[in-house]
Design a protein with these regions (language model features):
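Acidic, low-complexity Ser/Thr/Gly/Pro-rich repeat segments typical of extracellular/periplasmic
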Residues: 26-210
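Ser/Thr-rich, Pro/Gly/Ala-heavy low-complexity intrinsically disordered linkers and tails
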Residues: 13-31
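Sec-dependent bacterial lipoprotein signal peptides
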Residues: 1-14
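General secretory precursor processing signal
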Residues: 10-11, 19-20, 41, 49
């Protein structure tokens, strides 16, 4: 039986919020420096998984009750090595309902993923990717692929593409299971996710505060 390798939650935007987003800040009692700009669920790529409520903060000033709160180093640097400011994204109260859902597992392949040529497989009991509407509990039709724009096997991003519009203000859960590498071995799951999945105590405050 496949065990879940990754799972995260995200919220679709209803409209523009204020510009009062609060960022995660490390406690004065933290024993080590914590990079709150990055989600430890996907430690190999800062900013992933995306979109995610990890990169949001509660807000009384928005329709959704949340506001995007990307850190100054969350967005990857451009080709010139310059960071992109998240200022304008942080004015939003959720993420675009048209965005693909992306994460990263080193050496992940497309083997067994729901293909764009057979989308009906998203309903299979052993589907490797799940996209669930929290309000209805129903699966959302989608297909998945790995980024083919690079020859570096370890660097390819896993992308999930909904094939129907997601609801404004909707809340969704993504689940991933049984993704394999080029040798057919299950790709490694992050320690942070294993701690969350199995209910274990973590030394990482980014896990403990979830």
């Amino acid at each position: 039986m496949n065990r879940v390798q990754a799972c995260w939650v995200f919220l679709m935007a209803l409209g523009c919020g204020s510009d009062k987003a609060e960022e995660h800040t490390a406690s004065e009692t933290d024993a080590v420096a914590v990079d709150w700009d990055c989600d430890p669920i996907a430690p190999t790529r800062c900013g992933l998984p995306f979109p995610s409520t990890y990169f949001m903060t509660p807000s009384e000033d928005t329709v959704t009750g949340f506001q995007v709160a990307l850190g100054e180093t969350t967005i990857p640097a451009n080709i010139d090595g310059k960071m992109t400011s998240p200022r304008f994204l942080n004015e939003k109260d959720g993420f675009s309902p048209l965005t693909p859902l992306i994460t990263h597992f080193e050496y992940a392949t497309a083997e067994g993923l729901v293909s764009h040529t057979d989308i009906s497989r998203y309903l299979d009991a052993d589907a490797k990717t799940l996209l669930i509407d929290v309000a209805t509990g129903e699966r959302v039709p989608h297909f998945a692929e790995v980024d083919a724009s690079t020859d570096a096997d370890y660097a390819r991003i896993l992308m999930i593409h909904p094939v129907v519009p997601l609801a404004h203000g909707g809340r969704y859960v993504v689940g991933i299971q049984g993704v394999v590498d080029g040798d057919g071995a299950t790709v490694e799951t992050s320690e942070a996710f294993l701690e969350l999945r199995d209910g274990k105590t973590s030394a990482d405050p980014r896990v403990e505060t979830r």
